[in-house]
Design a protein with these regions (language model features):
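A short helix-coil junction within the Rossmann-fold of NAD(P)-dependent oxidoreductases
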Residues: 33-42
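Active-site loop immediately N-terminal to the catalytic Tyr-X3-Lys motif
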Residues: 58-62
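C-terminal helical subdomain
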Residues: 93, 110-146
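Active-site helix of classical SDR
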Residues: 31, 67
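Active-site-adjacent segment of SDR/Rossmann-fold oxidoreductases
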Residues: 56, 77-89
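Residue(s) in the substrate-gating loop at a strand-loop-helix junction
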Residues: 51
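Substrate-binding pocket helix/loop in short-chain dehydrogenase/reductase
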Residues: 5-8, 15-18
């Protein structure tokens, strides 16, 4: 994946459309296509990758944060439908914070929080999946950030995210 950094009014629309195609359209289509077969067999687990960003407002990265929120809400919604139909199929969401990947270079951002290794995130995620968890957030600091975001007013979270992102300009 990749992000588009900058004021929404100034960011490149073509890059944002590619971001939406990657983070929203592809996830939606692939989930729908794979889910049908899994439901027929009553077996399977789809893991969609969201982000801690999907739980926060995202000034200066509006398209990215919004796309990750879509992934989280889509997955949660489908999973609830599956549970209500007594299906054994699950749709999970991985909600990581910074992970050491090429994303930072492509998005041209630096993270204030310590990045987790991709190996740690993968092992943690598989462990939680095998235990039937569907809302997976690796890292204590990211879990804490997610909790604070949940109990904070949106306008306060927006201001904090803006100040944090602004330092990257």
């Amino acid at each position: 994946g990749f992000g588009v950094f900058g004021k929404f009014i100034n960011t490149d629309l073509d890059r944002e459309v590619k971001l939406i195609d990657t983070n929203v359209t592809a996830v939606h289509v692939l989930t729908k296509l794979f889910l049908k077969n899994m439901v027929e067999r009553d077996k399977g687990y789809i893991l969609n990758v969201s982000s801690i960003a999907g739980h926060l407002p995202g000034p200066l990265m509006a398209a990215y944060y919004s796309s990750k929120h879509y992934v989280y809400i889509l997955s949660e919604s489908i999973n609830e439908e599956l549970k209500k139909n007594n299906s054994k199929v699950r749709v999970g969401t991985l909600n990581p914070g910074p992970v050491r990947t090429n994303f930072n270079k492509v998005a041209n951002v630096k993270f204030d929080l310590k990045s987790l290794s991709s190996d740690y995130v993968a092992r943690y995620t598989v462990d939680k999946m095998l235990k039937g968890k569907t809302d997976i957030t690796p890292g204590l600091s990211i879990k804490l950030l997610r909790f604070v975001a949940k109990i904070s007013p949106t306008n306060l979270a927006s201001k904090v995210v803006y100040m944090t992102q602004k330092r990257r300009e």
